[in-house]
């Protein structure tokens, strides 16, 4: 039986046996031979129907043709199993008949196996006849088992999928064209099928070289009575082609035909969506697309920073690829040996002007550092979560070229202040000078820098530099470091380092982008330029008890350090007892940085004057991205100092201004001449070491 021609018709609900009306006999009637024949035929059909393996309520609904069709189908199935037992060698059952019973009742293993399937069993002959369909077909298609047995399979397949289903029934997926009067078997088919049949009859099984040709897995649309929308349900057919023994078919001339390959498969529905599923198990089936395009939620796209155009031609693993914004960053830079060096971020670098530069002196990644890092990772449960989040950034694909920046001063007449302006000049690489007696920075320490040139660190300074790590971003082991050419060393203005990095010092640009593109607000250090942009660790701090409000007002008006934030807070100045106010009383020096390193970083201020007892205002030191303890970064710095102008010698050490630490607890600090709110620092600010007496200097970034 092949694909039906003519108009496309699909199988529907079968016609049931009509209810016969019985007339009451009124006495003796004349006998009718035709009626007696029909009665004998109906009696035989009823007896035949009673022999079918169905329940009485199902049998009572069957018409005469259905009883004959099901009887033929039952006999064919029985003949198949009898022939299978004769040709195949069956091993002895592992369990005895007594063990197949539960509490004296036999266990129907076949029914339990069918119920466990996420689908139904189906056997289709080579002619397209449904040889067998399990009773569970009614749960998926709405057809009862008695409706489909020994029926044409193409009546249930969508018209667009019938040719594909016909190809699946052939061993080479190339069925021959059936011509009237000729055998459907070609010479090639007879040769291959004969070889397969002899191998299986001999008990050897199917040859391995033909196993790939006999495996089937395809999808077709099948007629479904349970679907009220389209009437079809997409089903997956998965199984193999096997010989259907015991059919004993013959040609028109009477020659017996060999067994034909038939499709033995499990038919499972391909469910369209999760909300429409009616499933017995947790296994799902889906039809994959060829491009393997991943679909993402809008929230997932926001996290991964990917759009539809980026996801369309990509594979699934690219959708969740890291963009380097979260987790642990990997810095990558080119060394002087023309190879790339990678290193993990040691800590978060808190700089005065927000420059994302990180300086790591050579030799800090020693054995003791690795031991300290492992010890920190063992005692910190949160560090293991960061260890699993390795994210790599490949922003530095080219060597970093630094751009030399010139700084000039610009006087503002209205506010009587001096403003720094940055002017670009020629792209000349800056060189680093190794000074004598400079302080070695602690890049692992978590510190705070203020405009008053005070650096406070939470960690003690008793351990070597390699033992320090930031509490915000703990370092991990296995750091591959490389060295950068010292001729291109670059230090950010107000960074944690208090001097120029040594020769062989490592420099990595944070977040994986180049320095030139990021436009870092920092200064290239040239030869002869002092590189103490911040106050060194030796800052003298003077502690005094609280005094009267008059003393506070007088002290704040004569010699105070005011860090401006905004003019809105002038009338709302409130003291906080938990915070301390830091102010400086420096002796003015013409140069603002370490004198033994050369000329001043900012140069001599042409607008500066030496006055006695007057307030001198210097350049604004803070940028909009300053990292300090206060919520808002300051914009300007106004410094008042006494008159004493001496140019220190080049051999003197850099000294810090004397910082007085006083409590701020009264709103009477707001003097008429005050323009901004003083900076607040908590009492828990770390103390620093007091150096020996000497000439003082003012440190400007």
From Swiss-Prot:
<comment type="function">
    <text>Mediates dioxin toxicity and is involved in regulation of cell growth and differentiation. Represses the transcription activity of AHR by competing with this transcription factor for heterodimer formation with the ARNT and subsequently binding to the xenobiotic response element (XRE) sequence present in the promoter regulatory region of variety of genes. Represses CYP1A1 by binding the XRE sequence and recruiting ANKRA2, HDAC4 and/or HDAC5. Autoregulates its expression by associating with its own XRE site.</text>
</comment>
<keyword id="KW-0805">Transcription regulation</keyword>
<dbReference type="InterPro" id="IPR013767">
    <property type="entry name" value="PAS_fold"/>
</dbReference>
<dbReference type="GO" id="GO:0000122">
    <property type="term" value="P:negative regulation of transcription by RNA polymerase II"/>
</dbReference>
<dbReference type="Pfam" id="PF00010">
    <property type="entry name" value="HLH"/>
</dbReference>
<dbReference type="InterPro" id="IPR000014">
    <property type="entry name" value="PAS"/>
</dbReference>
<dbReference type="GO" id="GO:0006805">
    <property type="term" value="P:xenobiotic metabolic process"/>
</dbReference>
<dbReference type="InterPro" id="IPR039091">
    <property type="entry name" value="AHR/AHRR"/>
</dbReference>
<dbReference type="GO" id="GO:0003677">
    <property type="term" value="F:DNA binding"/>
</dbReference>
<keyword id="KW-0238">DNA-binding</keyword>
<dbReference type="Pfam" id="PF00989">
    <property type="entry name" value="PAS"/>
</dbReference>
<dbReference type="GO" id="GO:0046983">
    <property type="term" value="F:protein dimerization activity"/>
</dbReference>
<keyword id="KW-1017">Isopeptide bond</keyword>
<feature type="region of interest" description="Disordered">
    <location>
        <begin position="409"/>
        <end position="432"/>
    </location>
</feature>
<feature type="cross-link" description="Glycyl lysine isopeptide (Lys-Gly) (interchain with G-Cter in SUMO2)">
    <location>
        <position position="583"/>
    </location>
</feature>
<feature type="compositionally biased region" description="Polar residues">
    <location>
        <begin position="409"/>
        <end position="430"/>
    </location>
</feature>
<protein>
    <recommendedName>
        <fullName>Aryl hydrocarbon receptor repressor</fullName>
    </recommendedName>
</protein>
<dbReference type="GO" id="GO:0005737">
    <property type="term" value="C:cytoplasm"/>
</dbReference>
<feature type="region of interest" description="Needed for transcriptional repression">
    <location>
        <begin position="555"/>
        <end position="701"/>
    </location>
</feature>
<dbReference type="GO" id="GO:0045892">
    <property type="term" value="P:negative regulation of DNA-templated transcription"/>
</dbReference>
<keyword id="KW-0539">Nucleus</keyword>
<dbReference type="InterPro" id="IPR036638">
    <property type="entry name" value="HLH_DNA-bd_sf"/>
</dbReference>
<dbReference type="GO" id="GO:0033235">
    <property type="term" value="P:positive regulation of protein sumoylation"/>
</dbReference>
<feature type="cross-link" description="Glycyl lysine isopeptide (Lys-Gly) (interchain with G-Cter in SUMO2)">
    <location>
        <position position="660"/>
    </location>
</feature>
<keyword id="KW-0963">Cytoplasm</keyword>
<dbReference type="GO" id="GO:0009410">
    <property type="term" value="P:response to xenobiotic stimulus"/>
</dbReference>
<feature type="domain" description="bHLH">
    <location>
        <begin position="25"/>
        <end position="78"/>
    </location>
</feature>
<feature type="domain" description="PAS">
    <location>
        <begin position="106"/>
        <end position="176"/>
    </location>
</feature>
<dbReference type="InterPro" id="IPR011598">
    <property type="entry name" value="bHLH_dom"/>
</dbReference>
<dbReference type="InterPro" id="IPR035965">
    <property type="entry name" value="PAS-like_dom_sf"/>
</dbReference>
<dbReference type="InterPro" id="IPR039092">
    <property type="entry name" value="AHRR_bHLH"/>
</dbReference>
<keyword id="KW-0804">Transcription</keyword>
<dbReference type="GO" id="GO:0005634">
    <property type="term" value="C:nucleus"/>
</dbReference>
<comment type="subunit">
    <text>Interacts with ARNT, ANKRA2, HDAC4 and HDAC5. Interacts with ARNT; forms a heterodimer with ARNT.</text>
</comment>
<keyword id="KW-0832">Ubl conjugation</keyword>
């Amino acid at each position: 039986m092949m694909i039906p021609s003519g108009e496309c018709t699909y199988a529907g609900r079968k016609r049931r046996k009509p209810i016969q009306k019985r007339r009451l006999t009124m006495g003796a009637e004349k006998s009718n031979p035709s009626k007696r024949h029909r009665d004998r035929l109906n009696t035989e059909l009823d007896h035949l129907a009673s022999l079918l393996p169905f329940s009485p309520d199902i049998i009572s609904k069957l018409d005469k043709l259905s009883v004959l069709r099901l009887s033929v189908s039952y006999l064919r199935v029985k003949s198949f199993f009898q022939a299978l037992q004769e040709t195949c060698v069956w091993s002895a059952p592992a369990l005895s008949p007594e063990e197949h019973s539960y509490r004296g009742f036999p266990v129907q293993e076949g029914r339990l196996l069918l119920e466990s399937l996420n689908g139904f069993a189906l056997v289709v002959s080579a002619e397209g006849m449904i040889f067998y369909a399990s009773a569970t077909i009614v749960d998926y298609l709405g057809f009862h088992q008695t409706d489909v047995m020994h029926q044409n399979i193409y009546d249930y397949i969508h018209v667009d999928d019938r040719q594909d289903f016909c190809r699946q029934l052939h061993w080479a997926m190339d069925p021959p064209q059936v011509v009237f009067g000729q055998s459907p078997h070609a010479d090639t088919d007879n040769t291959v099928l004969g070889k397969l049949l002899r191998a299986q009859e001999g008990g050897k099984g199917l040859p391995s070289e033909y196993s790939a040709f006999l495996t089937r897995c395809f999808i077709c649309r099948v007629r479904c009575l349970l679907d009220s929308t389209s009437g079809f349900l997409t089903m997956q057919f998965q199984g193999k082609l096997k010989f259907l023994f015991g059919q004993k078919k013959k040609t028109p001339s009477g020659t017996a035909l060999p067994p034909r390959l038939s499709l033995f498969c499990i038919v499972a529905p391909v469910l369209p969506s999760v909300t429409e599923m009616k499933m017995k198990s947790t296994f799902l089936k889906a039809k994959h697309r060829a491009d393997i395009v991943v679909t993402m939620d809008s929230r997932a796209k926001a996290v991964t920073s990917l759009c539809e155009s980026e996801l369309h031609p990509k594979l699934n693993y690219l959708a969740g690829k890291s963009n380097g914004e979260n987790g642990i960053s990997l810095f990558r830079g080119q060394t002087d040996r023309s190879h790339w060096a990678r290193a993990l971020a040691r800590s978060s670098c808190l700089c005065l002007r927000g420059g994302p530069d990180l300086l790591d002196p050579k030799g800090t990644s020693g054995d003791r550092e690795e031991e300290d890092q492992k010890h920190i990772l063992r005692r910190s449960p949160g560090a293991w979560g960061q260890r699993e989040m390795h994210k790599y950034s490949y922003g530095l694909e080219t060597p970093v070229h630094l751009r030399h920046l010139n700084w000039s001063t610009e006087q503002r007449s209205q506010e009587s202040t001096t403003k720094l302006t940055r002017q670009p000049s020629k792209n000349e690489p800056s060189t680093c000078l190794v000074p004598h007696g400079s302080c070695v920075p602690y890049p692992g320490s978590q510190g705070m820098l203020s405009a008053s040139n005070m650096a406070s660190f939470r960690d003690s300074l008793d351990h070597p530099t390699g033992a320090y790590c930031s509490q915000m971003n703990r370092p991990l082991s296995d750091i591959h470091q490389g060295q950068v050419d010292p001729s291109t060393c670059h230090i950010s203005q107000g960074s944690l380092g208090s001097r120029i990095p040594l020769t062989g010092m490592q420099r990595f640009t944070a977040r994986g982008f180049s320095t030139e593109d990021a436009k870092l607000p920092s200064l290239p250090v040239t030869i002869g330029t002092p590189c103490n942009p911040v106050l060194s660790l030796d800052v003298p701090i003077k502690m005094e008890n609280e005094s009267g409000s008059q003393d506070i007002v007088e002290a704040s008006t004569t010699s105070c350090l005011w860090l401006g934030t905004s003019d809105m807070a002038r009338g709302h100045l409130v003291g906080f007892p938990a915070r301390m106010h830091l102010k400086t009383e420096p002796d003015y020096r013409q140069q603002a940085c370490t004198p033994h390193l050369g000329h001043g970083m900012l140069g001599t201020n042409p607008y500066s004057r030496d006055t006695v007892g007057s307030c001198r205002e210097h350049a604004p030191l803070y940028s909009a991205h300053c990292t300090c303890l206060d919520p808002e970064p300051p914009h300007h710095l106004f410094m008042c100092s006494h008159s004493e102008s001496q140019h220190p010698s080049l051999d003197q050490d850099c000294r810090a201004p004397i910082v007085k630490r006083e409590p701020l607890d009264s709103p009477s600090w707001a003097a008429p001449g005050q323009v901004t709110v003083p900076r607040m620092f908590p009492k828990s600010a770390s103390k620093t070491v007091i150096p020996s007496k000497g000439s003082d200097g003012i440190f400007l970034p």
